[in-house]
């Protein structure tokens, strides 16, 4: 591969072809199409593709002759990605926020139609939360963290979650579809979810989404505190600190992190019994 790369202009051209392939990964790309995308001749592009294929980074369908990045390429990317999972990546942010704000901080991650508490840093004030302890879960749309995640999902996914979860969120006694959609739009406009939902008496919270490189919400940072501590004067400061940490974490997320698909596997114990129950039920 080294000789071929040197003859055709080196590493920049190789990466140009890789980027062009990533843009057509679903359908695959032909030599002519890829050559136009990178501004090289077909002969040069073909040599680069063959060199990448020889290294196992590119594969060509025998029938269609279309090129795609190979599974070996993605396996290499996963291995070279951020070695820490989302929980490890966010732990310093939780500690900083807890120390700065003096309140309990939660890391929630999406798990199908739910949000799961992946980590928390306890503040000095006794509070209740929708997920309870680490491992607790709640329907997407219920509580600030789960609402922040739902609001910033791609539209098609968001609609699917709303349809599935509507009957679940109604169990809390204050939600209907109009209310939920209004809240989602409000969160999208403000960039955060909060403050007092009225579901937990005396409690308040605010959350911001953690977005991956594609702008998709994969998690949320949330503050849980007593209502008196989240007044109009303090809210902007809390939101700003949350957003700053979320923006710093987002670009570092490893898209191959198993936590994003199966968060329970990253927990030493999953305790969904500690989640806040719908209206009329006591937290265990």
Placement of each model-derived feature along the sequence:
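N-terminal helix-turn-helix
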Residues: 1-84, 251-255, 282
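C-terminal effector-binding regulatory domain of bacterial HTH transcription factors
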Residues: 26, 37, 214-222, 226-284
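Amphipathic alpha-helical regulatory segments at dimerization interfaces
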Residues: 20, 37, 88-100, 106, ...
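Extended hydrophobic
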Residues: 175-246
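Short, structured helix-loop boundary elements
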Residues: 8-11, 31, 66, 70, ...
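Amphipathic alpha-helical effector-binding/dimerization core
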Residues: 64-164
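Short, solvent-exposed recognition segments
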Residues: 126-199, 268, 274
